[in-house]
A protein has these predicted regions:
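ATP-dependent small-molecule kinase phosphotransfer cores
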Residues: 2-17, 58-136, 141-142
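Phosphate-binding P-loop
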Residues: 25-32
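Short glycine-/polar-rich loops that comprise or flank the Walker A/P-loop
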Residues: 32, 61-63, 154-159, 209-211
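Short hydrophobic/aromatic beta-strand immediately N-terminal to the Walker A/P-loop
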Residues: 34-36, 137
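Glycine-rich phosphate-binding P-loop
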Residues: 36-54
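Zinc-dependent deaminase catalytic domain
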Residues: 46, 68, 80-120, 198, ...
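Conserved phosphate-donor/acceptor-positioning beta-strand/loop module used by diverse small-molecule
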Residues: 139-142, 150-178
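Small-molecule kinase domains that catalyze NTP-dependent phosphoryl transfer to phosphate-bearing small molecules
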Residues: 176-227
Length: 399
């Protein structure tokens, strides 16, 4: 199915998703896989794609690449007349945002990738390619809703690889290999990380959804071995077991599942000498220590939460409420005719990053306090967390 207009993409989406769903049901667990790559701008994804292709060839897999920039955005909105690489990359970001906004669909680019995969699949069927399986590498994914849609369509056949490369390396790659001045390269990196618009680039929010993480830090042999290990796991090597770091992160993720916070769910664990010392989640602390757990109400014969306990029971987030009150307090001290502009500025300001006024204890703090309650020393321990610590948690971790 070849899509050439955004209107066609929206119109054909139901049939396109139906076809993909049927194929998912009819193929074996590893007869077809779709690999999405998520990374910040400046990461050398060409090198990663080549390594994935080389490794999959050892398993007799045919590997095809779907580039969102050329196979979806350019197909729908044209290549554009760019004079340099900065204009090209910035222009592609803008076009991707426009597609999401015009379609009112944040996974529109994922639908385009699915359409391209269907097209490649049909071509392989015509050519009768004799391979054990087929893999499609999507380069690259920039919005969480794209991930959700691809997982909905392909199920366990979709895998998301998060590629980490430190900012200095990415900046150098953009300057050296793309010929972009440092100031403009820095603008691209900042824009790619997290735009204000809901239809924009949200690499930071997408990255943590990955199934596997690869570190592109210049150690080529380690990167090759990490990719080998990933595919050994996928293809059922029974002797590949988790490292302790992986196990601890799994425990942190599991701990996050017990959070009922209204903003997001975070988990953390403290570990020492290859043993888990404590777990923590971001939720409202309970009198006497620890967090609220659901309890069994014998009278109603059902599990319930304590009245006035967690925020969702109360029906509001005290931190969000306090941030609104701060903004309203500032606006009330500004002349009425100027308030509209100031309100927009304040709503997009760093005030929205304030976390001090929430009732919840953060996951990292709860993990530390759990050790304190049971007289376990945290000296020389390691903390594993599903997100980066805030400034308050960072101070407590260091102390």
């Amino acid at each position: 199915m070849k899509i050439t207009k955004i209107t066609e993409l929206n119109k054909e989406a139901p049939q396109l998703l139906k076809n993909s769903g049927e194929d998912k049901q009819s193929t074996g667990p590893l007869a077809e896989m779709v690999i999405g790559l998520v990374s910040s701008v400046g990461t050398d994804l060409e090198a990663i794609t080549k390594k994935i292709r080389d490794r999959l060839s050892l398993y007799k897999f045919e590997c095809s690449e779907v580039r969102i920039s050329s196979d979806v955005i350019a197909e729908l909105l044209g290549n554009g007349d760019y004079t340099d690489n900065y204009q090209r990359i910035d222009g592609l970001m803008t076009k991707g945002n426009k597609l999401r906004e015009d379609s009112e669909c944040n996974y529109i680019l994922a639908l385009g990738a699915i359409a391209k995969i269907n097209e490649i699949r049909a071509k392989h069927a015509r050519l009768q390619i004799n391979k054990k399986g087929i893999a499609y590498v999507i380069n690259s994914i920039k919005h969480p809703e794209e991930v959700y849609k691809l997982r909905e369509v392909y199920g366990s056949g979709f895998l998301l690889f998060g590629i980490f490369s430190d900012e200095s390396r990415r900046l150098d790659n953009i300057i050296r290999n793309k010929g972009i001045p440092e100031d403009k390269a820095a603008l691209l990196i900042a824009r790619d990380e997290d735009e204000e618009s809901g239809h924009g680039q949200h690499t930071r929010d997408t990255f943590h959804l990955a199934d596997f993480f690869l570190n592109q830090d210049g150690r080529d042999d380690k990167l090759n071995n990490d990719i080998k290990r990933v595919f050994d796991l996928l293809f059922g090597n029974p002797f590949i077991t988790p490292t302790f770091d992986e196990y601890a992160m799994y425990m942190a993720f599991s701990s996050a599942l017990r959070s009922a916070d209204l903003s997001r769910q975070v988990g953390a664990v403290l570990a020492k000498n290859y043993a888990i010392m404590s777990t923590g989640a971001n939720d409202v602390p309970k009198s006497g220590g620890g967090l609220y757990w659901p309890y069994f109400n014998a009278e109603n014969e059902s599990y319930e939460d304590y009245p006035e306990g967690r925020d969702y029971v109360r029906g509001f987030d005290s931190n969000a409420k306090q941030k609104r009150e701060i903004i309203h307090d500032i606006l009330n001290q500004i002349p009425r005719k100027s308030r509209d502009n100031f309100e927009r500025i304040l709503n997009n300001s760093l005030i929205q990053d304030i976390t001090e006024y929430g009732r919840v204890v953060h996951a990292e703090m709860e993990a530390i306090l759990a050790c304190a309650r049971t007289n376990i020393s945290t000296q020389d321990a390691y903390i594993y967390c599903t997100t980066f610590p805030c400034h308050n948690c960072a101070k407590h971790i260091i102390a």
